[in-house]
């Protein structure tokens, strides 16, 4: 397979530990996996071997790319069945999982998923809004799965709770090739107040120590 040059070395994919009720979710996960392999991009993900997590991690691993899973000890018996895929880092808390995924990745993509996927997605969006990172965040909007969320965010913009600049943190597309192209072209934009904020050490914003990002 011919490789396509990418600005990213590793992309973190948030997705469900379930497979969903439509074959289109399965197909989208495989298409994204194949696009990562084609572009010579490694995978960071939640560490499970079930649902969409297991599907995309196995496909990327089979394609010869490195797979790094981050999973809390308490979830391992539930989300890992049989042999683990690729490299797995075990952490103590959900917060540490998100921090390590954020530290390891150059960009983020959310496939369809449940509460855990939503929470991971919204946290990295918030980190971007606060200037903690400048990494692209994309929604793989399979069959309009995220249409309602995007409408909800647009409502928050209209009502004055989210700035129009912060709205542009998120990019979305219905398929993996289009989404990855948008991520490649992404240019960070922040509200003026962000440039006035000083974090203790933004280069080490994502750590596993204490309660820091």
From Swiss-Prot:
Main localization (coarse): cytoplasm
Tissue: Expressed in roots and shoots. Detected in root hairs.
Pfam family name, one: Lysine_decarbox
Native species: Arabidopsis thaliana
Residues given in the record as substrate binding sites: 79, 97-98, 114-120, 126
Protein name per its UniProtKB record: Cytokinin riboside 5'-monophosphate phosphoribohydrolase LOG2
Phenotype when the gene is knocked out: No visible phenotype under normal growth conditions; due to the redundancy with other LOG proteins.
EC number(s) from the headed UniProt entry: 3.2.2.n1
Function recorded in the entry: Cytokinin-activating enzyme working in the direct activation pathway. Phosphoribohydrolase that converts inactive cytokinin nucleotides to the biologically active free-base forms.
Domain of life: Eukaryota
GO molecular function: cytokinin riboside 5'-monophosphate phosphoribohydrolase activity
Protein keywords: Cytokinin biosynthesis, Cytoplasm, Hydrolase, Nucleus
pH dependence statement: Optimum pH is 6.5.
Annotated GO biological process: cytokinin biosynthetic process
Family membership: Belongs to the LOG family.
Localization per record: Cytoplasm; Nucleus
Catalyzed reactions per annotation: N(6)-(dimethylallyl)adenosine 5'-phosphate + H2O = N(6)-dimethylallyladenine + D-ribose 5-phosphate; 9-ribosyl-trans-zeatin 5'-phosphate + H2O = trans-zeatin + D-ribose 5-phosphate
Cellular-component GO terms for this entry: cytosol; nucleus
SUPFAM superfamilies: MCP/YpsA-like (SSF102405)
């Amino acid at each position: 397979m011919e490789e396509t040059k990418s600005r990213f070395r590793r992309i973190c994919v948030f997705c469900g530990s379930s497979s969903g009720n439509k074959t289109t979710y399965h197909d989208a996960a495989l298409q994204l996996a194949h696009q990562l392999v084609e572009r010579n991009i490694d995978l960071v993900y939640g560490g499970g071997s079930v649902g969409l997590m297991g599907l995309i991690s196995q496909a990327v691993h089979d394609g010869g790319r490195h797979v790094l899973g981050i999973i809390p000890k308490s979830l391992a018996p539930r989300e890992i069945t049989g042999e683990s895929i690729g490299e797995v880092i075990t952490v103590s808390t959900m917060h540490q999982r998100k921090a390590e995924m954020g530290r390891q990745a150059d960009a983020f993509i959310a496939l369809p998923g449940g509460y855990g996927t939503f929470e991971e997605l919204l946290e990295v969006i918030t980190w971007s809004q606060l200037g903690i990172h400048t990494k692209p965040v994309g929604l793989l909007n399979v069959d309009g799965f995220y249409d309602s969320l995007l409408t909800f965010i647009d409502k928050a913009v209209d009502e004055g709770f989210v700035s129009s600049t912060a709205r542009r943190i998120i990019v979305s597309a219905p398929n993996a090739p289009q989404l990855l192209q948008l991520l490649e072209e992404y240019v960070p934009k922040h509200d003026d107040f962000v440039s006035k904020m000083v974090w203790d050490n933004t280069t080490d914003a994502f750590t596993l120590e204490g309660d820091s990002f």
